[in-house]
A protein has these predicted regions:
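N-terminal ligand-binding lobe of clamshell/alpha-beta domains
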Residues: 1-258
Length: 258
């Protein structure tokens, strides 16, 4: 089978199921596991290079209002790769090529490939996404084995975290200007690991915050995971954040747990 992944997490899922040799194309953001970046890239961003967090936010909001694209899909390369299956998502048009664009592209190919849309909002649904991928690729039993291994790992973490005497208040931030909480399964992961996350909601999208909400929450641990940014870029954005003056008021900063 010839598989094209239009989502970094889907690329990892394909490999988790042992189907890496079937992968023929990925996105410009796929970088794990090692070696996938050598595969043909089928996407590129339409956002200007070097734009700040606030500038990116404005551009994204404007384009979503007008149904404008955030990514470009290389139709010619897609045609050359002749995929049997395209794995994508319809959960968030900010995170990847819009599902409607993928559907139109697939229909334009000489041999229309199957499309698998992944839309998990909770950890259980992430495992269901693996199950769907295993089913469509003809290895449902192996997918169940992989899910079993992952489930046992989660159970081990939960079991150990229950022994923690103090559960720390956590702020998990997905964007800095404006501030965004975490969402979907991330608050769930924090709770499973022994933290308390109340700025984001399990199964719900991330939402905009203001610094007063963060200060009122008084987080003892802060995770910063800006969507699409690597560590150096995240640190750069943090140093220029409008809320940096509020940091001394946060317990997590005082204890160095950021």
């Amino acid at each position: 089978m010839r598989i094209v992944s239009l989502l970094p997490s889907a690329t990892e899922m394909v490999h988790a199921l042992g189907l890496g040799s079937d992968l023929v194309g990925v996105t410009h953001e796929c970088d794990f596991p090692l070696g996938v970046e050598e595969l043909p890239h089928l996407t590129s961003t339409l956002l200007p290079e070097g734009a700040s967090s606030s500038e990116i936010d404005v551009l994204v909001r404007e384009r979503l209002k007008t149904d404008g694209a955030l990514y470009e899909l290389d139709l010619e390369e897609l045609k050359n790769l002749e995929p049997d299956l395209i794995v994508t998502q319809a959960l968030c048009d900010v995170c990847a090529v819009a599902e409607s664009e993928v559907q139109a592209a697939a229909c334009s190919l000489p041999n229309t490939p199957a499309i698998l849309n992944l839309e998990p909002e909770t950890l259980a649904e992430v495992f269901d996404a693996l199950r769907q991928l295993g089913s469509v690729t003809g290895i449902p039993d192996h997918a169940e084995d992989v899910i079993g291994v992952l489930t046992r790992r989660v159970d081990t973490v939960v079991s150990r975290s229950q022994a923690v005497q103090k559960r720390h208040k956590v702020a998990f931030l997905e964007w800095l200007d404006p501030l965004f909480s975490c969402g979907h399964w991330t608050p769930e992961l924090v709770e499973m690991a022994g933290g308390i996350e109340r700025l984001g909601q399990v199964g719900q999208p991330s939402r905009t915050l203001d610094w007063m909400e963060v200060i009122a929450w008084q987080p003892e641990v802060i995770f910063i995971a800006c969507c699409g940014f690597d560590l150096p870029r995240t640190l750069e954005e943090l140093s220029g954040s409008s809320g940096i003056s509020c940091w001394p008021e946060l317990p997590a900063v005082e204890s160095g747990r950021v």
